[in-house]
């Protein structure tokens, strides 16, 4: 590995293909915490109607039901490296926009010749057309710059019949092109005699009967899809289907209603047990177990080991083996049959894998949480979920039940020992963990109520500080409303986009199940046919102090692995005045083959923009005359040499 300095420039190695500032999946991570704890720009002090608001709108060709995803420093074909937001629509389109300026880079339609998006299948839940509904997932390790995985529904109208398609697509982030082997038709079968069986002992996946409402999950090189019905229109069952990211070969299949039997008047044909979660995706823990909530449907007679003999799991909190997709544990409310009959299914919500917690006795517990229409928050011990209690009329077999009282159509968020839930026609509530137990009543709540379907909050912070809870409201006025609250106290609303006069921050009609994406100083919130991009308005730029500093580097040959290297980088104040922090070393003009590993952000205001920087602020907050501040910076490069120009910015202004 060779290094050379160019006039005020260094030749270093650059970064990881996956950066801390990416949002590559639903609710930020496979645990589905909804937390971005690397947000350095947006803090409670500057998120208000004077400093924060709508920057621009990204117009698209259909409804946006999927969460926008953010990819930093991605190599766009013919353009170079840019921060990009990916938007998918129900018109079967995928867009890549510049996340900082709104410039469109590419747009692809996933419709084959003579095809159109699916009709709504006689169901108004996703309407007027069905295309891409579930949030995609992005993997950067699969190539340079990476790959987007998503499911698209379409139809071909023939003279006598209409053929429906569900296809898994893998698209290059560089230009939206299909990667080798993409797309593949979604097909599956499962042993059973339940709804949709072929009369020969197998239930068949019929693409016309399903929609991919749940977000996709990526785990251990497998992309998992999970399937829901159209308005409970029979026949349908509960499918999870997994595909290998490289070959797109189907490698996992699970059906949790393979032998569905009528269990109530509400389910006359026994259909049910689907996965929809109001757009939430399956979650996964650090041990590789998957978690999900099923909707209304039959729950089978138990065998001696406590599992349903027929494999039917209605209204159930499932734990699945990633190796086989077998159900290895579960929790089902004792009154499951009544819940199914009353359409108060557990499957309207999503699961969240919580960090390890200590109880009052010092025991470390491994928890997950989920809630649905019945108004209860269920906390399960992932090691002993509790199965179902048929002996007594209670849920004493589960770790903890907290009565929320609000129906949940969405997912919670977790931050700093707190859980945030937003139910239907209810306030957004904060609950707090203590000694491994959740508070039985809210510790704070918003002053405004959210109508249908409630809200799925997201949180931004810098570590455990500067927490902001973001919540999307599908307002009764028909307009979309973005709210921001202090994560310390939800009664403190920092901002909502109706506060500014003259509709300055209006960004479109509201939509249900929308999750805001917060990354790198921006908030992306979908409306019916666009995505609003919010950020700081009147910005004070940081000062360029490069002329008053000296930047040195020293390679550490002992700390090298393949193309990775550790470099000691020093910034010395050679001027006559103290330099007040924050102080940032910016890596300008990086060649396209290079990355900076784990930067603290990228420039959005001080030109040139889009350059990554590393924080060099001393502990005292300022760099005194002749003082030197040193960091070990890791780099990676696809070439032998990497060139950049160092730039040093100082002060509290925006980079």
Predicted regions and their residues:
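Short aromatic-acidic-glycine turn motif
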Residues: 587-608
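Low-complexity, acidic Ser/Thr/Pro/Gly-rich terminal tails and inter-domain linkers that flank the onset
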Residues: 539-563
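Short, solvent-exposed loop/turn segments enriched in Ser/Thr/Gly
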Residues: 347-348, 560-568, 580, 629-631
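Extracellular adhesion/glycan-binding regions together with long Ser/Thr-
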Residues: 606-627
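Asparagine-centered strand-capping/turn motif at beta-strand->loop junctions
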Residues: 570-577, 589-591
